[in-house]
């Protein structure tokens, strides 16, 4: 992260376990902090690869690093084991009831400093935050270095297609589909 020294350092530290899992050097694809405010909505079941990431390369690993404790009550991550081997269900669409018929979403509560690593084909979701306190999670996503460095292009594309509220054209509808 060019904007925050601590996140830049963490992003570098996370490269080691991600590289070990990938079996080669990695580069950061994207990073974010998810803030889930009290009453804040969850995320419908999806695979990260459904959001058009295949335009850049075919495989990513994401590291979730817990900042604030996550619980079932404040909308912790829920993942499905084993279905990442099914590959991409459908690009630009969330998972359907038919896709999820034999999936069991498992809650993954975390404490500050805990890390969860999952790939771009792992079905996952979260529920709304029913607590009276905001909770935060840091996500860093990496791809193989041999597949290229796409970080700048990803953020340029995201800004162009889904700009922050302050930069949106009046009257234009922006829909993030996954």
Residue ranges of predicted features:
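Conserved short histidine dyad/triad with adjacent acidic residue
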Residues: 35-51, 70-72, 120-121, 125
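Non-catalytic surface loops within mature trypsin-like serine protease
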Residues: 37, 67-69, 142-144
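Short, surface-exposed recognition loops or helix-turn segments adjacent to catalytic cores
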Residues: 29-37, 77-80
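Acidic, His- and aromatic-enriched active-site or binding-groove loops in soluble protein domains
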Residues: 47-64
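Signature of the catalytic double-stranded beta-helix
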Residues: 1-32, 55-56
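Non-heme Fe(II)/2-oxoglutarate
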Residues: 122-123, 127-178
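A structural signal for short, well-ordered beta-strand segments
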Residues: 31-33, 63-65, 138-142
């Amino acid at each position: 992260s060019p904007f925050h020294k601590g996140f830049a350092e963490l992003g570098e530290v996370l490269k080691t376990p991600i590289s070990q899992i990938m079996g080669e050097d990695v580069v950061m694809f994207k990073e974010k902090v998810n803030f889930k405010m009290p009453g804040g909505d969850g995320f419908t079941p999806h695979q990260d690869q459904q959001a058009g990431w295949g335009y850049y390369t075919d495989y990513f690993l994401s590291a979730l690093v817990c900042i604030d404790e996550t619980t079932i009550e404040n909308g912790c991550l829920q993942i499905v084991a084993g279905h990442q081997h099914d590959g991409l269900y459908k690009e630009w669409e969330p998972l359907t009831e038919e896709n999820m018929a034999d999936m069991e979403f498992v809650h993954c509560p975390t404490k500050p400093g805990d890390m969860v690593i999952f790939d771009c084909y792992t079905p996952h979701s979260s529920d709304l935050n029913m607590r009276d306190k905001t909770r935060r999670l840091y996500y860093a996503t990496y791809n193989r270095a041999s597949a290229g460095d796409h970080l700048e292009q990803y953020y340029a594309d995201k800004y162009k297609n889904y700009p922050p509220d302050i930069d949106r054209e009046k009257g234009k509808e922006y829909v993030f589909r996954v």
